[in-house]
Amino acid sequence: MQPAKAIAAAPVAMPVPASAPAAAGLPGAVWAELAFFLLFAGFFFYQTLLGLGLIRAYLGGYFAVVSLLLLPPLLLSYVRRLQLRRYQLHRVDAAFLAFLAYFAVVIACNAPSANPAISSHHVLGVLYLFNLFVIFKTLDFQRRRFRLTLLASLAAMSAIVFAFSIDGAFYLAALGAARDPDSVATYQGFSRSYLVPLAVALACTPQRWLRWALYGLGLPTLYINTARSEFGALLFLIPLIEFHAARHKLAMLAVLLALFALLKLNLDAIVAAIPGNRTLELLNLSQSSSASMRHQLTLQALHTIALHPILGDYASYPGGLYAHNILSAWVDLGLFGFAALLVLLLYPMVQMALHAYVLGRRDSRGAAFLLAWSLLGMTALLLCMSHFFSDMLIGAALGAYARYRSGDGHA
């Protein structure tokens, strides 16, 4: 299959002057760092001010407007890097851009007859995927300034969640203080803006004590935010990261299993000690109305796929009522788009697993590997649980993977 062939290996780089990485790295890295904080922490703080009624919705819901404003500098920095490398496109980049191009063609071909709201949503999805890919491929996550700012922003976001939660749940729209309530984000927007920076911080933190402190901060924050999928994703990241970071992996596996058994034995006492909210529905999804709705949407998607197995049936559902999993790609992009997305995600994961756990490659011990490994694993999990095929995390994960495959901190 073409995507698999495209992503298989990095090309042999052309000779580049020694000064080129520095020249290419600084401007792009600065824009990527600015974009990262504007899109995640910036969104969180803007929405907080909006929800508290301290500002009007001057930027609407914020994310789309800011993403559009960031597109020109991110695109220019990406093109500049290609120029410095004599337009030699990395195969990971080529595969991802080919998928985006196919996605864009599908949107354009179906736009005249499709629901405009769905088409607009998908156009923004292409924008978010590209921007996040460039950010995570470009940004230097090891810079001291970046790491300190990241930790400070996580602490500030957690403080906001704890300070404005009511009865164990954080939902600013319920306060009734917003002057433009229709623009206030749901728990999903807040949780995304917290989980992504947290995942970056965890992957790039070598000190185990600091990682566990971040777990201790992140779990209650996402729990109170009532974001079940993101809370589950963090629970998934903990063993994924700690097992990989451990020198003695069998010992760490035993510790993780012991912690799981201890948690299970004391689950009733833990549940009784914490405030109740919808996150607890994870313990019994059969009682969750949201899970029931998602199951029905999945059945609807399977029915559509059975009727249109090759080309799918683009935007054949009411706005927002798409399958909340990777099957949404088959419905909107057809079999080829679905298969391409699977290859884009699964091939890197299989390759990285071989690098780390079979071949024991030295580069699999670095932060670049762990960041890509964490984001790919988390993205795959969320695409199985609740997220749709144009989820921006796909761009972030593949951007981090492209950075790892380049073998250069400023890929």
Residue ranges and their predicted role:
Residues A95-A98, L151-A159, R247-D268:
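Hydrophobic alpha-helical membrane-interfacial segments at the cytosolic entry of transmembrane helices
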Residues L26, V30, Y87, L335-T379, ...:
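Hydrophobic transmembrane alpha-helices and their immediate junctions
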Residues A57, K264-Q296, A315-Y317:
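Flexible juxtamembrane loops connecting transmembrane helices in multi-pass membrane enzymes
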Residues S286-A323, L333-A340:
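TM-adjacent membrane-interface loops and short helices in multi-pass inner/ER membrane proteins
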Residues Q2-R81, Y102-N110, I160-I166, M378, ...:
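N-terminal signal-anchor transmembrane segment
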Residues L26, Y78-A94, A203-A213, A245-A251, ...:
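Membrane-interface helix-loop-helix junctions at transmembrane boundaries of multi-pass membrane enzymes
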